[in-house]
Amino acid sequence: MKTTRAIAMLGLLLGLAACGTTPSTIVERPTTARPQAPAAVPATNGAIYQAATYRPLFEDRRARHVGDVLTIVINERTRAGKEASSSASKTSAVDASVGGVAKLPLKMFQGLGINAEASAEYEDESALDSSNTFSGNVTVTVIEVLPNGNLVVAGEKQIGLDKGTEYIRLSGVVQPDTIQAGNTVSSAKVADARIEYRSSAKFDKAEVMNWLGRFFLSFIPL
């Protein structure tokens, strides 16, 4: 009975150790527009121009309403560098002597001198350079129109490969004036942008600590 219980416990621990989770997403809002209730059709007054169905005649069809789509051209390059140096030095000296004192018990110590010197130096230099590049396209959906006319957009692209699935997610706020021809906008023009690339491949899962390891490190930090 005890042997069976020990084997079961060992199997449970091995299963927990093998469990790994993919990194959490930074895109918290929905990545697509929710179905909208049909808008009430306003009564027509017989005029050719109707504000509810207005579309500019001499410009491309661009995203304006909830549910419209536009393409974000991702072209992100970041680079950061840091250099630091420090140095310190310290020197100390001691010089002492015993003169001729007639009442000194031991005559052998008369004229004794002590001379000591000590020095210490410290110097440290460090340099850090990091660069990242992220390019691609992802089509997003307008999920909300703010009172000032700006568009809250979000979208996700999934690419299934032999060894896993790649996820590209994006969310942010787009100003309609920055939308270019072809209904595209540069990622540099997206406010509050959250752009991420994730993968469910085994290589990426190996970088995520399993559940059991995170449990023990929660109260036994390295």
UniProtKB/Swiss-Prot annotation:
Location (main, coarse): membrane
A Pfam family this chain is assigned to: FlgH
Subcellular location: Cell outer membrane; Bacterial flagellum basal body
Keyword Ribosomal protein: no
Chloroplast among keywords: no
GO terms under cellular component: bacterial-type flagellum basal body, distal rod, L ring; cell outer membrane
HAMAP family named among the record's database cross-references: FlgH
Protein name stated in the entry: Flagellar L-ring protein
Encoding gene, per UniProt annotation: flgH
